[in-house]
Design a protein with these regions (language model features):
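Contiguous hydrophobic segments
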Residues: 13, 116, 155-158
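Intrinsic disorder/low-complexity signal
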Residues: 2, 9-10, 23, 37, ...
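Short, low-complexity, charge-dense intrinsically disordered segments
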Residues: 1-31
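Acidic, low-complexity mobile loops and tails
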Residues: 32-91, 121, 125-158
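Short, intrinsically disordered low-complexity segments
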Residues: 16-17, 27, 40, 65, ...
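Mid-chain, well-packed structural core segment of small domains
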Residues: 92-130
Length: 158
């Protein structure tokens, strides 16, 4: 195999090759670490959105929080404001950088996750659960369908 000498057990046992193969291990590691929930939609700017009727919950993806590092502060000053899709609705501050947060769809932001005021690390620990950022009333639920599904977002993040 490619000029590398392997033990007879490895050569003759396909199951063993799958377990030991570094590329296979990387794929298993990546799929375990970087899984994207199928029930959410995603943006190329690394936000996720979950829709329940006309109310959407929005946060940043696992990929985004890993790239940012330890999150120390979230600022959203757009509560009660109507914003268009793509508008900046706040910022997230990590130890190494500050990043804008972009609204995936048009609507009015109703609520900021109150737990983030004292525990912004929830975004790092549970980005798709307790680490949600805002809830909003969307103008059109059809806009959500135009966003990326999990497979599309995974293709963006490589």
């Amino acid at each position: 195999m490619n000029g590398i000498k392997f033990s007879a057990n490895y050569e003759n046992n396909p199951a063993m090759r799958r377990v030991v193969n570094p590329f296979y291990s990387y794929l298993r590691y990546k799929s375990f670490i970087m899984s994207y929930p199928e029930n959410l939609r995603y943006t190329k700017d690394h936000e996720w959105i979950s829709l329940d009727g006309a109310i959407a919950t929005i946060g940043i993806t696992d990929f985004a929080q890993r790239e940012l590092g330890d999150i120390v502060y979230v600022e959203v000053e757009t509560i009660g404001k109507h914003l268009e899709a793509g508008a900046v609705f706040g910022t997230v501050e990590a130890v190494k950088t500050v990043s804008d947060l972009f609204l995936p769809v048009s609507g009015t932001i109703n609520e900021l996750n109150p737990a983030l005021a004292n525990s912004p690390e929830l975004i790092n620990n549970d980005p798709y659960g307790a680490g949600w950022m805002v809830k909003m009333k969307v103008d059109s639920s059809a806009d959500v369908d135009d966003l990326l599904d999990a497979a599309g977002y995974e293709a963006v993040t490589g």
